[in-house]
Amino acid sequence: MRPFLLAGLAALALAGCQKSTETAITRTTANGVDTLYSKRTVVDGVARFECMASRSGQCHYLLLDPACRPDAACARAPIRSFALAVGTTQEFRDLPKGFAQCVSEDRKEQCHRE
């Protein structure tokens, strides 16, 4: 009986140790070639951005307040704007939970298209 109890407690302990993870991939292609390829992961509040391909040589990011949506105008200014060269990554630990993003091969002031 005791081994079953210990095994059950170990399983519960491991279940409590799982990290909160979110992944988003943005990828566009033209004629079978990546024009933009970006990956964002958020693990336990640490957001990691990775620029894997961009026709311009850089991935340009806008990070938005959780109340904003990338497909609509928002009165609030972006939380952060930055660019990454292809093959590089950037981490942030201070972003609000639920932030939105848009990424493009060229610098933009807003995410939505007019």
Please give the residue ranges for each predicted region.
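Extracellular/mature segments of secreted proteins
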Residues: 59-60, 66-69, 76, 81-84, ...
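Positively charged n-region of N-terminal signal peptides that target proteins for export
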Residues: 1-3
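Post-signal peptide N-terminal segment of mature Sec-exported envelope proteins
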Residues: 25-43
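Intrinsically disordered, low-complexity Pro/Gly/Ser/Thr-rich segments with frequent PxxP/GP/PP motifs
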Residues: 70-100
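Sec-dependent N-terminal signal peptides
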Residues: 5-12
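Post-signal-peptide N-terminal segment of Sec-exported extracytoplasmic proteins
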Residues: 39-67
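N-terminal Sec signal peptide cleavage junction
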Residues: 16-17
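Terminal connector regions
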Residues: 92-114
